């Protein structure tokens, strides 16, 4: 039956007890099953839209329902609507400097924490949001998207604004776009990896650094881990899912989040992070590091991790992350 075949193709033996011959046989069986059920085996799509893209100079000023501004140094790009205020750092790969929603009284909930924010030496770094980090432990290399970018803008038919850029890295192009809703408290971060080489390491993207009330002890993280109901995790102790236990294993573990939703809530406010698992089955990772009266609170999304059973993919695919308050018109 179809259910039996699905379970056979989902067996952990194809990951932990595998030979080259059996691996190719399983791939052939999977291809035949997809064809029989008329399911495409295509993986990864570009989130860029057709239409005329405008340059930064053309977009500055009133752009649709938004106001687009650039600072005197040409570094910080500010996009403002009635419901959203967002600053992007064009010198650091279009990472999010700060993001605020109207229902949060425009107090930033996500953004960048600069070096020196924490007095603890172990946390002495810049912590960005919306970036890509590729760790290659065997090569002892780290690749990021923190490069100077030249964004282009598209005003969609529904009034939403898309900002996109292409970043060249040693392993391939990172095609990155950010879409701002004109009607809801929602943005989306979209990533597409074109013609990438094989990665012997980890790829973490859509990295979120929480600010203000969302970065304090007692914040709740809610998600489903295979069941119907959400599980609730209260951040009050050190959490380091991003840490690497050895050079052969890149992470201790992560969240299941099987529905493609994570909610982050404090006493009065809520954030919703959502994605489509059928398009990209990322693994969310949490980091919570208390430091005196402050805390570093971050959520990462892993497209691939590394251990001694890793199989390489010829296509890295795409990922789209929606960030919202869950409030819609």
Residue ranges and their predicted role:
Residues 1-97, 103-126:
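Histidine-centered catalytic/metal-binding microenvironments
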Residues 71-75, 91-95, 158-159, 227, ...:
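A short, compositionally biased
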Residues 77, 83-92, 174-180, 271-275:
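Broad, structure-driven detector of short, well-ordered beta-strand segments within folded domains
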Residues 83, 115-156, 177, 206-237, ...:
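Extended, charge-rich low-complexity regions and/or helical-solenoid scaffolds
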Residues 90-95, 115, 179-184, 277-281:
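A short, sequence-level motif marking secondary-structure junctions
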Residues 93, 100-102, 169-177, 181-233, ...:
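Acidic (Asp/Glu-rich), glycine- and aromatic
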Residues 128-196, 290-295:
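Extended, loop-rich substrate-binding clefts of extracytoplasmic carbohydrate-active enzymes
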Residues 157-158, 162-170, 186, 196, ...:
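Beta-strand-rich recognition/accessory modules
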